[in-house]
Amino acid sequence: MKTVQISLNSIDKVKSFVNEITKYDYDFDLVSGRYVIDAKSIMGIFSLDLSKPIDLNIHADGALDEILAVLAPYIIK
């Protein structure tokens, strides 16, 4: 598992983020405070406070480098 911080501060970013990760057959969780939601759920993402950075847990072993490259626009360095 790999954890990165991401920013999803607009509706367009949320839609494109979900479209990107649904291409992968791995589990992705978003953690904000005490809430953990499925990152592939648009409704779940909108239940979080999107004004703050969110932790993304990526449960993937094989394609981790590829996934991180695709998610680069959302990752906070």
Question: What are these model-predicted stretches?
Answer:
Residues T3, K13, K23, A63-E66:
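Intrinsically disordered regulatory regions flanking bHLH/HLH domains
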Residues V4, V18-T22, D29, N57, ...:
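N-terminal intrinsically disordered, cationic/polar leader segments
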